[in-house]
């Protein structure tokens, strides 16, 4: 009886933890919202204007709002620059469509409608919507890590590492698509893992297809990620559904081993993504009169830099880098070798999905995310997808070392809370990290330690900037080396236990 109830208890614990984590994430997001200035930063007002245009005019045409200024006092305190691609629109064009993708306004439109019905200010309704959608991302990180590691506490630590980090808190409630893009990515990886354990399940395949099809709606640069995810789904279908048994009339009609048929699974993979991508292409053609749906949004920004260099900048720059601003993320580097050792297949899947998109992202001219919070918002999808490494590390260590893990996580929380409470105006690549400048001033430390390592043009600042980069590289390599040592010790321990078991079995037979 107890054994039969164990799966039920496990599922109940998972969903109770997920629901609790969602509530906590919403509370954190609302706290951040009440610490910050009223007006959204960076591209936020433009996404808000797009949402308002959709709800109030039934179109993404932003020309009436831009020209009339009806957004002033609602989404912005002052007039905005027109975020319109001049290659496609002129002042005399009857309609203007921005160079921002329209997926985020689509997701936020229901919250704006609900806000109008409940007499909630329009901007506040959109920000609450962002809090709820971003909280889903934290929950999916937990579920993805749990799917891989099968240890509730370890998966929860991975999610908390994200929730308390400065990069997440800096984006919480902000109207940027990066956390939602990361949510779609980690949700897709979760679907692939579910398919790995239930190869002929239809629901994970359909959700994977829908997520991959919707990703370009959030940002056109996710197109490569979508293609990779769909290719992995097709590879899974071919490997698990095209067996000789499945190709027989009986197998094709009823499926194999009680599962769904290969044709049904193929339909679940192709139809949602196909319909979404076709709708996206038709909309882009109607607005911009081109079937090259990347053209209106790239605006000459892609392939500006050679691949790779901006990855170093996004990792180690004192202002825009994710590692100096998020000590907890260093645990990812320690955990990666353990992930590779314990579950190489899932690690390879993540690598195949992430690496092409990361290299493409590294060619982007605006490498640091424009006017954005410190901490590298463009790398958030890659952070989400690699956070299970923290869970693998936690599961491997004993309690004393687990407590030691809490030090960088707690340091990240302190930095994130401090950054949020100071409510700095967003900054650009090459600008000083305002939080670091404030902290150095408080402790009477040389302010040039806050110098950005890289300029806006990705030039390395000499002198102290070079020294800081070398220190950062040294710390990162030390973290990776520590992970390799832990993984090797685990491997030797497993081999020793296996040898002892064989000796014991031989003695019993004797």
Regions found by a protein language model. Name each.
Residues 56-127, 297-305, 365:
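Interfacial juxtamembrane loops and adjacent helix segments
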Residues 149, 188-205, 215, 239-243, ...:
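Membrane-interface transmembrane helices that cradle and orient dolichyl/undecaprenyl
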Residues 167-180, 321, 375:
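Short acidic/glycine- and proline-prone juxtamembrane loop motifs at membrane-interface regions
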Residues 216, 235, 239, 261-335, ...:
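Membrane-lumen/periplasm interface segments of specific transmembrane helices
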């Amino acid at each position: 009886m107890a054994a039969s109830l164990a799966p039920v208890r496990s599922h109940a614990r998972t969903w109770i933890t997920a629901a609790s984590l969602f509530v906590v994430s919403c509370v954190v997001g609302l706290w951040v919202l009440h610490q910050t200035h009223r007006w959204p930063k960076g591209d936020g007002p433009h996404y808000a204007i797009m949402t308002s245009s959709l709800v109030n005019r039934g179109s993404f045409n932003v020309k009436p709002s831009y020209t009339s200024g009806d957004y002033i006092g609602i989404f912005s305190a002052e007039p905005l620059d027109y975020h319109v691609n001049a290659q496609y629109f002129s002042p005399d064009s009857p309609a203007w469509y921005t160079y921002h993708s329209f997926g985020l306004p689509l997701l936020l439109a229901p919250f704006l409608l609900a806000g109008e019905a409940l007499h909630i200010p329009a901007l506040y309704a959109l920000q609450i919507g962002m809090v709820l959608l971003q909280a889903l991302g934290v929950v999916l990180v937990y579920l993805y890590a749990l799917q891989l590691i099968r240890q509730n506490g370890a998966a929860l630590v991975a999610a908390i590492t994200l929730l308390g980090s400065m990069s997440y808190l800096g984006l919480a409630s902000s109207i940027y698509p990066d956390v939602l893009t990361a949510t779609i990515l980690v949700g897709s990886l979760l679907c692939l893992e579910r398919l790995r354990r239930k190869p002929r399940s239809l629901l994970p395949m359909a959700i994977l297809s829908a997520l991959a099809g919707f990703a370009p709606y959030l940002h056109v640069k996710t197109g490569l990620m979508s293609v990779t995810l769909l290719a992995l789904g097709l590879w899974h279908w071919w490997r698990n559904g095209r067996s000789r048994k499945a190709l027989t009339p009986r197998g094709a009609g009823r499926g194999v081993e009680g599962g769904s048929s290969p044709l049904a699974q193929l339909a679940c993979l192709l139809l949602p993504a196909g319909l979404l991508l076709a709708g996206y292409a038709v909309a882009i053609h109607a607005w911009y009169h081109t079937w090259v749906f990347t053209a209106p949004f790239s605006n000459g920004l892609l392939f500006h830099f050679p691949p790779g260099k901006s990855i170093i900048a996004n990792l180690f720059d004192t202002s825009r880098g994710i590692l100096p601003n998020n000590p907890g993320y260093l645990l990812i580097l320690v955990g990666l070798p353990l992930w590779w050792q314990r579950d190489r297949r899932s690690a390879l899947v993540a690598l195949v999905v992430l690496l092409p998109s990361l290299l493409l992202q590294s060619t982007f001219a605006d490498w640091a995310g424009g006017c954005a919070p410190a901490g590298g918002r463009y790398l958030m999808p890659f952070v989400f997808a690699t956070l299970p490494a923290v869970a693998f590390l936690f599961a491997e260590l004993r309690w004393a070392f687990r407590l030691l893990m809490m030090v960088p996580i707690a340091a990240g929380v302190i930095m994130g809370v401090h950054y949020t409470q100071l409510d700095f105006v967003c900054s650009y690549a090459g600008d000083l990290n305002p939080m670091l400048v404030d902290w150095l001033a408080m402790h009477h430390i040389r302010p040039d330690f806050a110098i950005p390592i890289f300029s806006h043009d990705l030039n390395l600042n000499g002198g102290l900037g070079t020294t800081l980069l070398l220190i950062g590289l040294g710390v990162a390599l030390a973290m990776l080396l520590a992970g390799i040592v832990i993984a090797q010790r685990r491997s030797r321990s497993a081999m020793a236990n296996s040898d002892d078991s064989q000796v014991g079995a031989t003695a019993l037979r004797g």
